[in-house]
Regions:
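Mixed-charge (Asp/Glu-Lys/Arg
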Residues: 1-196
Length: 196
């Protein structure tokens, strides 16, 4: 399949076949699969790094439409690089997880800022993705943010979660309610083979 060269477009093209053909096995060539490759992408193009990092958790970049648009925006993001949306109660109203991506040095003040942004934007949770290892004070700051109590799943989720790129490459996932509606789902393929 020939696809666009942005990591935002690659992410969408990667999700769709997995949804349509859950048993199919395929490989995406050209996106980072190691920390070294991720560091190089961050040096080459910070925005592409952000979009790629967001794709690791299936978050929609800020500025991309909820209908699955491939267009993200560059520029002032008010402390938010991406969004995950989920539905976890009978109102069917989407709730938000705000995502911030950092490729440089990180500190506890960035976690405090994310906590403030989550409150200001009336989101339910926040995720901080970092290329560098988080500091002890960062982890402590995230822990003091408390929990989001999901009415539909009757359980608590950490309100602020920190992930390294290494953890995400190893398969670690955001601990959030299962009703993820960030991107429009592709229909599963029916029948024995592809149709035209």
């Amino acid at each position: 399949i020939g696809i666009d060269v942005t990591h935002l477009a690659i992410a969408l093209q990667k999700y769709r076949p997995k949804e349509m053909f859950p048993d199919a096995d395929f490989v995406v060539i050209g996106e980072p699969t190691t920390i070294g490759a991720a560091q190089q992408l961050a040096l080459d193009d910070r925005h592409q790094f952000e979009w790629w990092a967001l794709s690791l958790i299936k978050a929609r970049p800020v500025g991309a439409q909820s209908t699955g648009s491939k267009k993200g925006k560059k520029g002032a993001d008010q402390g938010v690089d991406g969004v995950l949306t989920f539905i976890d109660d009978a109102t069917n109203k989407p709730k938000r997880v705000l995502v911030q991506v950092k490729s440089g040095k990180v500190s506890s003040s960035q976690i405090r800022d994310l906590v403030g942004t989550v409150k200001r934007e009336k989101a339910q949770m926040g995720v901080f993705i970092t290329l560098e290892e988080p500091t002890g004070p960062m982890l402590k700051e995230a822990a003091t943010a408390g929990f989001y109590e999901s009415p539909g799943f009757n359980r608590a989720y950490p309100a602020i979660q920190i992930f390294t790129i290494k953890q995400l490459l190893e398969g670690k996932a955001v601990d959030m309610p299962a009703g993820n509606v960030t991107f429009k789902q592709a229909e599963k393929a029916k029948g024995d083979g592809p149709e035209q």
